[in-house]
């Protein structure tokens, strides 16, 4: 030992750089360090530790630090490494800071560059805008030019048409002149013939006359031809006229030279020539139209037998129109004729001169004709001049019209520009006014800062009117809120308790917890306070045994249960007549001693009022009228008239802040595929048997008479079943906290056992509905629907400003995460489940140890199972590894599910959870609507936690109903969403129809199915809608005020009961005639039964409504439950072909002493468990099955017992107080026998 000490002292410390040996032969460790590699701080620390160890070795021994030194060395090494890492990180941090500075500099540079680019962009936009304006201006000018050209084109067309009309008029005038000239020529010829016959005196005179006749004959042919319509105005005939004249003259001269002239020859030649001239004159128009071919140039010049006139006529085929007027043509013709006659005969004599030389008496008419022709020519010339002037004027008018149009367009453009400039000026003036007002306001504010408030400027009239109007609106809202707050405060005051400190009270309850045993409880006092009600006893929570007598002790969880005077029950419900628990539900802090004393006095008055007989009898927790009590005096003989309470307990003991919102029974009917196969196995007790198949019931196949009769009986029994009797005994209850919403599945026959519980979403679930599986009739209805006939795109415009009746088709675009919904849950649902897990971890109660790999959501399930009576605890610390692996497999197969440890078999399919086949929406489904607009569809058969479909709707979902193979969803924006099945039987949530029923600012509060129609409540109106055609069949006003909204509706038979918000009156309407049948006010009844005044029972508001078991079930806002039997006389004597009218009378009403401390949330009616037949299926007999009516609400209260008695009758859990029991949601179940 001394040698080791000397060696240690000689070696010095770790700063010497030498090696130091510690320990014995079995445990030695060498530590060598280099000063340049070790951090200085670690070196100093190691030196100080070395000195301490040296003192310890000197004082004690080497063995003291033998085992500690290696550990310390490791610590120092780790510290050194951490220091080095820290230094490296400091260096990296400096580098990162430099990089950050560079990035900031670059960011600033990029920011400035972006500003410059934005500035350039703005400049480019300005340039583009200016170019657009210039182009627009050019476009306007081009358009004006185009319009001007179009106008000119139009004017030119009009001018051309006028020219054509002028040409037509000239042709008509020419024809008239030609006829006139022909008549004059005929008169002249006749005159000449008479003259020649009178002349016979001398031969010289006759020769002279014959010469003149020849000359006149030579002139007649060209004159007749030139004066006719064929040669007039055509330049091509001028040469032909000259040639014909020469030919005729030559022929005539030859004939004259061939023989001696005589009077007889001249007369013989003149007569046929005259006749030919007349015929030629009459047939000029016909010869003009003829198309005889011309003779070739090398033929014989003239045929002697052909008259000379025909030769001239044959040359008028290709004549062209000349541009000469009538005067020019006539003058040209006269000149031509004179030249021809001079050439042929050598001299030309005017007819006037001939007439004067021969005989002035006979030839005076020709001069008059010539005068007339001259006058006519002058008139024609004047007319032509006037026409020319007129044409010039028309052209000038057209030019002026075009200029006027151009000026008009320019004027309109100037007016538009002036209007734009005025608008711009007005805008600038408004901006200037606003700027001036702002400047004035700023100046005024600056001035008013130094002015007291009393001396400042007052409001104007407009501002005062606006302020008053806003004040009135706010005042109306304030009054409504004050009324709601007053009712809430009254109800809250009715639930206040004595002034007790929470901490002291909790400690006292813990300290004296052993004193509250069943033997020390004042059960006798409770039994005495029940009046004519049933006795109570203490039994085990899971024991189905009954004891009829004094209270006895149970072996399990102690609960207050019905005993003694309980009626005989159905054998299947033997396990239900146990454990009617009536715990107290207090959650508010106590007030002063004066308030607690007043509270006790109020409950004493209420208890005294309730215990009054007043002609009523108390039985089974109900207050019965005297006439009903006489009928129910012998319970054994007639026990089916009064509902018997069989269960009352919180839904989830471990979740005090979880509130129930809604619930629905599961309808397991249907589930047939298109080929007729059922999704539910045949060995399941809920499987549809052959006697109940619709296809076999309605099939027209040949059967034996007995089998056919059995099927008809089965069909009739199936049709006469009430809707609630077709449900199963499973109930889905939706509960919500501030963070998540959860669904709990319970069996009403064993309400204390929660089969499954799983989260749905983070929002509140507002409604739930059960939808039966696909029936074979649904496929035929789907194929024959109007929506399919319209190509799935049925749309219809709305009416009015609210678009009432508008139908629009919505198709949801598929998303990638929705496509993977069948394999894994969506991200939103996983987030919702995580929030639900966080919400379930808030309880501080002890839990049994569970597997570390199991999800935290199961902790909530275990908490609930611990609190439920009679629930076996199968998950404990003693689970084997195989069980843990099995639980892990279950959780992995169903991601995010919440499964109870007690759930081993599916009660419907009879299989284990992990062995359940994949579910589809062809089978029975449960539809849930959330406040955020999501609609969730889960299977009602198996794998309850898995979401089959979901869709986001435009607004919150408030109600869901199923009718005629359609699911109709009411939204908060006054729309109905209608879903239908696909051709394979699954529900199609990717496409649906929206039907608008009113203003989008108000919601559709509730839906109801009456027959084959849907009753939808929107504000104070009720719309009856056909779910197939989506037409609004009828609408009615349930209340005269629009502000009074319809809140609940319940249909049965031929009537629909309707309740109004903030109203205690129920209204009954006929489903077929839509007539108002009856009004029932429940407020006087509640006030009579429970008293009025300070407890707030006079303010009755209906919050839940249901018709079941031939009863009208009513739940109020203060927790009172009323059951009103329907009129039996109406049921027996009704002759309505459409159904029975559900009339009722409040004189027969029954009030339950078991109620809730807050509003009643829901009623659910499901049948009790049916006895299976030999084949394993359910049998339906003629008698109606017994029903279980479940009611849910917040807290529990018995109106017959005061607070102190109820506190003494409560058994608390180990770490539980009365305060946290007041926040729980309670379920109350009644058994109603219909036999």
Curated annotation (Swiss-Prot):
Q: Name one GO cellular component term.
A: Golgi membrane
Renumbered to this chain, the Polar residues biased-composition regions fall at 282-293, 874-897
Function statement: The JNK-interacting protein (JIP) group of scaffold proteins selectively mediates JNK-signaling by aggregating specific components of the MAPK cascade to form a functional JNK signaling module. May function as a regulator of vesicle transport, through interactions with the JNK-signaling components and motor proteins. Syd is required for efficient kinesin-I mediated axonal transport.
Q: Where is the composition biased (Pro residues)?
A: 294-307
Q: How does it assemble?
A: Forms homo- and heterooligomeric complexes. Binds the TPR motif-containing C-terminal of kinesin light chain, Klc. Pre-assembled syd scaffolding complexes are then transported as a cargo of kinesin, to the required subcellular location.
Composition-biased stretches, type Gly residues, lie in 529-543
Q: What is this protein called?
A: JNK-interacting protein 3
- Gene that produces this protein: syd
Note the superkingdom of the native organism: Eukaryota
Signal peptide residue numbers: none
Protein's organism: Drosophila pseudoobscura pseudoobscura
